[in-house]
Amino acid sequence: GPVAVTFVMDDERLGKYRDRKFTFNGEKRVFHMEAAENAKPADLVIVAVKYNGLESAIDTMSTSVGEDTVIMSVMNGIDSEKKIAARYGWGHTIDAIAQGMDAMRFGDDLTCTHRGQLCIGMEREEQRENLEKVVRFFQEIHMPYTEESDILHRMWAKFMMNVGVNQACAAFETDYAGTLEEGSDANRIMLAAMREVIALANSEGIGLT
């Protein structure tokens, strides 16, 4: 229920969001929010911020991380886990990526028809116990998820798609369908950007093709 989830933030953000009214698919939602200085260690910390807010979030969540806390980033990209592990250790983390959702936000209103799922896994043996804990928890709450045998490949594959599609859409002011038009400049740029990610992934030992 709502009391089982707390949004932890700094004082500035708490003042900004505390009295706002939020809706999900037209239904009012009330979220429990707390200043970081008052937070207690949590069983699971979910990191869901924009990339330029990651370093600040790593500091802000320090009071929420205890001896047995599992930290799960659901951010796009391929290095948020490394940044979190550099501060708190791989023994606190699992790897995760969100996919399949079509959520759109308009101010404080969120809409979606497909909620998607979380792809979760581990890249180091010291993450195994954390992964098992999260799997049991997701099963208990009926959270849609897939346990990936090669989570790094999954993360790099989504990164490749995001880089290719987002760059092409921004450069040519088109949508996803526009990037798929064979022979178009948007399609050419999308594929070129994806090939750059493939080369980078291969250099990191990820068999992306």
Spans of model-derived segments:
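Residues at the C-termini of beta-strands that transition into short coil/loop
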Residues: 9-11, 37-39, 75, 97, ...
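Conserved N-terminal Rossmann-fold NAD(P) cofactor-binding segment
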Residues: 2-42
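Positions that flank functional sites
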Residues: 13, 100, 153
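Short phosphate-engaging motifs
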Residues: 13, 53-54, 80, 126-130
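Active-site-adjacent beta-strand anchor residues
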Residues: 7-8, 47-48, 74, 121, ...
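Internal alpha-helical scaffold of NAD(P)-dependent oxidoreductase catalytic cores
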Residues: 16, 63-64, 87-92, 107, ...
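Rossmann-like NAD(P)(H) cofactor-binding subdomain of soluble oxidoreductases
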Residues: 25-109
